Amino acid sequence: MARKKIALVGAGNIGGTLAHLIGLKELGDVVLFDIAEGTPQGKALDIAESTPIEGVDASYSGSNDYAAIKDADVVIVTAGVPRKPGMSRDDLIGINAKVMSAVGQGIRANCPNAFVICITNPLDAMVWVLREVSGLPHNKVVGMAGVLDSARFRYFLSEEFNVSVKDVNAFVLGGHGDTMVPLPRYSTVAGIPLPDLVKMGWTTQEKLDQIIQRTRDGGAEIVGLLKTGSAFYAPAAAAVQMAEAYLKDQKRVLPCAAWVEGQYGLDGIYVGVPTIIGAGGIEKVIEIELNADEKAAFAKSVDSVRGLIAASKELMPK
């Protein structure tokens, strides 16, 4: 059976990290695309030269021509500008909406059957633009946010409880921004919900609230430390997990920015929800029961995403 083809649109820090991880997991051949001449070619060659050391059989190539992504099975989009200190994800909308329009046209022309994962911020709105322009089915275009936000939440909880990250399950609902909604009631350590761990004296509600806020600020914390860009190792790992679930039909339950129509009382919007990812793309949106506080927080997050999508509509090339 021929190897799968994975196209990475954007050869910056995330794109390069994605290419390396995809090779290490032997998910398929990799094409790096970027408008910067030499960058995708150089990174592809560098990673290709590591394959004899790592024992990886995969082809790597770089290009400045969208034709190179033709017939890709998976496309992961990281093109656009990253955050700098003091910026919110939403500040990027003016530039990145135009970038997503160009990328969407490239996908429509070259690989209309691909499963597309978007990482570019402001995430939920950029997924919407990408889907609108590419014309792909909603279940084949998705945003990487929830896996990353949930991973940050899980890591902070594992540090607080001094337990393996493998024993911590947690997930985050809503938009990928300051209004995201970490859900303690649905987050567990070895199956024990966080509210019960507070009652057991493992932590305090105050500490838990601090961890939830740190999760919301997780991206900004890294931007502040790096000063010249944003996170790339964890976002790349999150997108690869989603791509692997699709390519191997794993039916993984993963939170991501998916098209929600009917569930949660929503009438068609991209926002972070738990989903099942398999060979059909987003095969199911899982609708969980929310209490009054969680519903209010989720509604606030949805409103924020709606505002960003409305702004994106104005910015898209006519």
From Swiss-Prot:
The active site is at residue 176. GO terms for molecular function: L-lactate dehydrogenase activity; L-malate dehydrogenase (NAD+) activity. Substrate binds at residues 83, 89, 121, 152. It comes from the Bacteria. Its EC number is 1.1.1.37. Keywords: NAD, Oxidoreductase, Tricarboxylic acid cycle. It is an enzyme of class 1 (oxidoreductase). It holds the Pfam family Ldh_1_N. NAD(+) binds at residues 10-15, 34, 96, 119-121. It catalyses: (S)-malate + NAD(+) = oxaloacetate + NADH + H(+). GO terms for biological process: lactate metabolic process; tricarboxylic acid cycle. The keyword DNA repair does not apply. Gene3D superfamilies: Lactate dehydrogenase/glycoside hydrolase, family 4, C-terminal, NAD(P)-binding Rossmann-like Domain. SUPFAM superfamilies: LDH C-terminal domain-like, NAD(P)-binding Rossmann-fold domains. Belongs to the LDH/MDH superfamily. MDH type 3 family. PANTHER family: L-2-HYDROXYCARBOXYLATE DEHYDROGENASE (NAD(P)(+)), L-LACTATE DEHYDROGENASE. Catalyzes the reversible oxidation of malate to oxaloacetate. This is Malate dehydrogenase. It comes from Rhodospirillum rubrum (strain ATCC 11170 / ATH 1.1.1 / DSM 467 / LMG 4362 / NCIMB 8255 / S1).
